[in-house]
Swiss-Prot record:
Pfam families the record matches: Myotub-related, PH-GRAM_MTMR6-like
Primary localisation category: cytoplasm
GO CC annotation terms, alphabetical: cytoplasm; endoplasmic reticulum; endoplasmic reticulum-Golgi intermediate compartment; nuclear envelope; perinuclear region of cytoplasm; ruffle membrane
Entry's free-text remark on domains: The GRAM domain is required for cell membrane localization. The C-terminus domain (aa 540-655) mediates interaction with MTMR9.
Name of the molecule in the record: Phosphatidylinositol-3,5-bisphosphate 3-phosphatase MTMR6
Binding positions for a 1,2-diacyl-sn-glycero-3-phospho-(1D-myo-inositol-3-phosphate) per the UniProt entry: N286, N311, I312, S375, D376, G377, W378, D379, R380, R420
Length: 655
């Protein structure tokens, strides 16, 4: 609270950035230790978590007041007009401090209290068991074993304690390969295809320098290849663009030639002492020693494949360009699509999906194992491995399975959530929408295969909400070792049980578990299959959304059908009792009920599309009255909906 200078400002205006007639709402702005709260004249509340705030901008003073623009990590943008410049300045400075915490203990998760006891908290963390997940895949088995080499995080600090490696890989091979790979991230198992034992493995790039090689690393890759009895060759998939890597390799060769020439001159110069010669050569070698990719001459039975996904800096720039297009008011159709194309965002989404498709085809069609890496193996590698597994295994397309997939390929294998999401006040160049891209790829798959996923779009959006909210401990920290040091399981709560408690909200009414059980997804990545995810990037701009949702109507119809089936069963049971001769006055009335006695509505229009449930907030930071799943009946009767809201139920979902 020491950062809050002004706790309450009245007569603040909230503008609609897409309104054609500059409509606004007038209300009171509050600052709390965790939230910014705006209450309009109709007592409608808008909550914004401080951790969601990406940037705050105070614009030049106008005749109507001082503008304050807040951009959030969940792509919400709010534009306030504060009457007095002094109040605006105080709010601005407070938000700058509150949105950028210096240490983990100051994040919301460490103070959030859902009123659970320690046992309930522990049960929530134990909901996802990765050891059980590997057992589901049939591991350990004759070809794969659980290694304890990283039990104390001595082999690789950013990997989990439990690593699955080929049974023929000895401890010296594991340690030697780790020393040869960037950040010590050696090749380990991510996914094993049941029945064929073709595997998806992951690692970081090798420290190959000019011509360096590592026998232990070569032996480990050979062991991975032999662990697949169905195919003796394997793919090494480098997710980086080939042209950049070729340019890097050419540069290394040029530097190598220079070193050879210089070293030759040094050795021929008798005036230079031997110690100086060694120092200079070592210095030049250290400067030239780089990181690269595997030399096919040193690795037998591998096939090399580049898939061309750009780095975190390109992705951050691409998203920024996309958001600039989204925030532009009054763009023509041509200008919007031109800006969307110029951002390159959908092109990057396609590149990630194409890489995952290559993995799936290699395993299904060629029965070949695949080793995936990028630079350090925690960004592009996580994207490709998780999406490849999603295409191959229908379990990951269930709600529980998707949670397991995120825990396995993202959280346990050290995707740097806190750095990529900017949880703390750190280097802005480390922030990048890597996980957002993953969720968007999954959304595109749900659009192409609407019956294949148990969860709906709301589930993906809710997860995206909480990677930035810092309300739960799942996404805090950059690796498992760091999370253990923070004692997150003792001090914070897991997100997953809260999502499962509201499972009904996130169910896909089109899901067919029987037809999808053994299906491998084969998405089409032609350009016409990619579209702008409006419900992600404009989820809070309600004026841009249609009034009804086909999926919500289907969900209501399903609920009605279930209720009708229960009514039919009740009536059949009572009719059966009547036929057996047991007839009472109450039973007779039940067999011939009045029309209103049926539990289901005779007319769909009589019911709201989504019922209001105030028992649990869908997103922490919204009041029950402002829940995303609120009924819009009252709002629809107005000339124009409210400007900013956390809702998206009926008004968001489109067919």
């Amino acid at each position: 609270m020491e950062h809050i200078r002004t706790t309450k400002v009245e007569q603040v205006k909230l503008l609609d950035r897409f309104s054609t007639n500059n409509k606004s709402l007038t209300g009171t702005l509050y600052l709390t230790a965790t939230h910014l709260l705006f209450i309009d004249a109709h007592q409608k509340e808008t909550w914004i978590l401080h951790h969601h705030i990406a940037s705050v901008e105070k614009l030049a003073l106008t005749t109507s007041g001082c503008p304050l623009v807040i951009q959030c990590k969940n792509f919400r943008i709010v534009h306030f007009i504060v009457p007095r410049e002094r109040d605006c300045h105080d709010i601005y400075n407070s938000l700058l401090q509150l949105s950028k915490q210096a240490k983990y203990e100051d994040l919301y998760a460490f103070s959030y209290n859902p009123k659970q006891n320690d046992t309930e908290r522990l049960n929530g963390w134990q909901l996802i068991d990765l050891a059980a997940e590997y057992e589901r895949m049939g591991v350990p088995n004759a070809n794969w074993q659980l290694s304890d080499a990283n039990r104390e995080y001595k082999v690789c600090e950013t990997y989990p304690r439990e690593l699955y490696v080929p049974r023929t890989a000895s401890r010296p091979v594991i340690v030697g390969s780790s020393n040869f790979r960037s950040k010590g991230r050696l090749p380990v198992l991510s996914y094993c295809q049941q029945g064929t034992e073709a595997a998806i493995c992951r690692c970081s790039q090798p420290l190959s320098g000019f011509s360096a090689r590592c026998l232990e690393d070569e032996h480990l890759l050979q062991a991975i290849s032999k662990a697949n009895p169905g195919n003796r060759y394997m793919y090494v998939v480098d997710t980086r663009p080939k042209l950049r890597m070729q340019s890097w390799w050419d540069t290394q060769k040029d530097i190598g030639r220079i070193i050879v020439r210089i070293s030759s001159k040094i050795w021929n110069d008798e005036k230079i002492r031997e110690s100086d010669e060694k120092k200079r050569l070592n210095a030049m070698a250290n400067r030239a020693a780089g990181k690269g990719y595997e030399n096919e001459d040193n690795y037998s039975n591998i096939r090399f494949q580049f898939v061309g996904i750009e780095n975190i800096h390109v992705m951050r720039s691409s998203l920024q360009k996309l958001l600039e297009v989204n925030g532009s008011k009054g763009l023509s159709v041509n200008d919007f699509y031109s800006g969307l194309e110029s951002s390159g965002w959908l092109r990057h989404i396609k590149a990630v999906l194409d890489a995952a498709i290559f993995l799936a085809k290699a395993i299904v069609v060629e029965n070949a194992s695949v080793l995936v890496h990028c630079s350090d193996g925690w960004d592009r590698t996580s994207q490709v491995c998780s999406l490849g597994s999603l295409l191959l295994d229908s379990y990951y397309r269930t709600m529980k399975g998707f949670m397991v997939l995120i825990e396995k390929d993202w959280i346990s294998f050290g995707h740097k959530f806190s750095e990529r999401c900017g949880h703390l006040d750190g280097d802005p160049k480390e922030v990048s929408p890597v996980f957002t891209q993953f969720l968007e790829c999954v959304w595109h798959l749900t659009e192409q295969f609407p019956q294949a996923f148990e969860f709906n779009e709301a589930f993906l959006l809710q997860i995206h909400e909480h990677i930035h909210s810092c309300q739960f401990g799942n996404f805090l920290g950059n690796c498992q070792k760091e999370r253990e040091e923070l004692r997150l399981k003792e001090k914070t709560y897991s997100l997953w049980p809260f999502l499962l408690a509201d499972k009904k909200k996130y169910l896909n009414p089109l899901y067919s578990s029987k037809s999808q059980r053994l299906t491998v997804l084969e998405p089409n990545t032609a350009s016409f299959n990619f579209k702008f995810w409006r419900n992600m990037y404009h989820q809070f701009d309600r004026t841009l959304h249609p009034r009804q949702s086909v999926l919500n109507i289907i969900m209501n119809m399903n609920e009605q059908n279930k209720q009708l089936e229960e009514d039919v069963k009740d009536l059949e049971a009572k009719i059966k009792q009547c036929k057996s001769g047991i007839l009472t006055k109450d039973l007779l009335h039940a067999v011939h009920p009045e029309s209103p006695s049926l539990k289901t509505s005779l007319c769909l229009k009589e019911q709201s599309l989504l019922p209001v449930k105030d028992t649990l907030r869908a997103v922490e930071g919204s009041s029950p009255a402002d829940n995303r799943y609120c009924d819009y009946t009252e709002e629809f009767s107005k000339s124009e909906p409210a400007v900013v809201s956390l809702e998206y139920g009926v008004a968001r979902m489109t067919c």
